[in-house]
């Protein structure tokens, strides 16, 4: 005979199991039905390279999914002082009149994203350290650390490219006086930035933002168009029929009866985005060196002034001596 306590525990267990199953089912279904929606944006780098987004060769891992090379820029001060808030401005230029192929095959605007690798100790400045101007420039932006123990590696995106072609990162420099692991000196800064969707998923599968090519040599005998599922292109070869499936999005540029060679394009290339990298440097300046330099310059200026005054004095003495003579 079941007691009320056991019945209550049993009901809670059943509820927890149902919630877990529903959650997993929703996650799996969304990944299967809409795999392109979140593909090839900065957070995918966290999945494929959890330790660091920068390979030993210097390449940012985002380039594995975004195959087209595009321009990217980052502007930061040449040098900063300890515990200073400054702007790192990332520029991701592109032609805003162009639209990209979305996951469902329709056209839409481009999103942008970026990963900014700052030196150790540098991080996104807390809100209470931002000026009113900087708060306005970063309004609506959400910056995320690449990993819990890597505050200096920051990712953002996907966000609207029409609104954020320039992204302002509010950065706080470290203070060697409070952090003994930090030293004054010159440090490297690495940027990876993309606009638009990628061509390859982290699993290695191609997205619909690609140019698709024939898998065999032969003659195209049938082109079956399904607006929702894509297009099936049947190629008759010496070994039989081969069907190449083109997802919705790319435009088919071949016709029935056309001879085709393996590797020849079946569609246009719909990709209008791409990925870019930029490396730069920043100097964490020791204030004592600045004060010393200022004192040195002031000393030189005073010395020059004294020399000029002394020269004038000597000239007056010489002039007076000549008059007496």
UniProtKB/Swiss-Prot annotation:
Keyword check for Thylakoid: yes
Gene3D superfamilies in UniProt: 2.40.50.100, Cytochrome f large domain (2.60.40.830), Single helix bin (1.20.5.700)
Cofactor(s) this protein requires: heme
Gene source species: Picosynechococcus sp. (strain ATCC 27264 / PCC 7002 / PR-6) (Agmenellum quadruplicatum)
Top-rank taxon: Bacteria
Chief subcellular location: membrane
Residues in the signal sequence: 1-40
Keyword match Cytoplasm: no
GO CC aspect terms: plasma membrane-derived thylakoid membrane
Function: Component of the cytochrome b6-f complex, which mediates electron transfer between photosystem II (PSII) and photosystem I (PSI), cyclic electron flow around PSI, and state transitions.
Family membership: Belongs to the cytochrome f family.
Keywords: Electron transport, Heme, Iron, Membrane, Metal-binding, Photosynthesis, Signal, Thylakoid, Transmembrane, Transmembrane helix, Transport
Cofactor details (free text): Binds 1 heme group covalently.
Single GO MF descriptor: electron transfer activity
Binding locations of heme: 41, 62, 65-66
Self-association state and partner proteins as the record states: The 4 large subunits of the cytochrome b6-f complex are cytochrome b6, subunit IV (17 kDa polypeptide, PetD), cytochrome f and the Rieske protein, while the 4 small subunits are PetG, PetL, PetM and PetN. The complex functions as a dimer.
Name by which UniProt lists this protein: Cytochrome f
TM helices/strands, residue ranges: 290-309
Pfam entry (one): Apocytochr_F_C
Bilayer topology annotation: Single-pass membrane protein
Subcellular location: Cellular thylakoid membrane
GO process terms (BP): photosynthesis
């Amino acid at each position: 005979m079941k007691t009320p306590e056991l019945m209550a525990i049993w009901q809670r267990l059943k509820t927890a199991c149902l919630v877990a199953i529903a959650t997993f089912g929703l996650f799996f279904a969304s990944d299967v039905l809409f795999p392109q929606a979140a593909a090839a944006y900065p957070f995918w780098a966290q999945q494929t390279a959890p330790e660091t987004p920068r390979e030993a060769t210097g390449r940012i891992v985002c380039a594995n999914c975004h195959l087209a090379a595009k321009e990217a820029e980052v502007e930061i001060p040449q040098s900063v002082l300890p515990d200073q808030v400054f702007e790192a401005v990332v520029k991701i230029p592109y032609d805003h009149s162009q639209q990209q192929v979305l996951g469902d095959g329709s056209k839409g605007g481009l999103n942008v994203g970026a990963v900014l690798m700052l030196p150790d100790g540098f991080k996104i400045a807390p809100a209470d350290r931002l000026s009113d101007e900087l708060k306005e420039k970063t309004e609506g932006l959400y910056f995320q650390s690449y990993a819990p123990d890597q505050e200096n590696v920051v990712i953002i995106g996907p966000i609207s490219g029409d609104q954020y072609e320039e992204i302002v990162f509010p950065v706080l420099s470290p203070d060697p006086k409070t952090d003994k692991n930090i030293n004054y000196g010159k440090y490297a800064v690495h940027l990876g930035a993309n606009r638009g969707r990628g061509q390859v998923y982290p699993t290695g599968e191609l997205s619909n933002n690609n140019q698709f090519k024939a898998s065999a040599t032969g003659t195209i005998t049938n082109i079956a168009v399904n607006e929702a599922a894509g297009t099936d292109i049947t190629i008759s070869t010496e070994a039989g029929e081969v069907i190449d499936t083109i997802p919705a999005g790319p435009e088919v540029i071949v016709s029935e009866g056309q001879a085709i060679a393996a590797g020849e394009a079946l569609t246009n290339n719909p990709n209008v985005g791409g990925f870019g990298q930029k490396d730069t440097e920043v100097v964490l300046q020791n204030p004592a060196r600045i004060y010393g330099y200022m004192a040195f310059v002031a000393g030189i200026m005073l010395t020059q002034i004294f020399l000029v005054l002394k020269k004038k004095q000597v000239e007056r003495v010489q002039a007076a001596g000549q008059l007496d003579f």
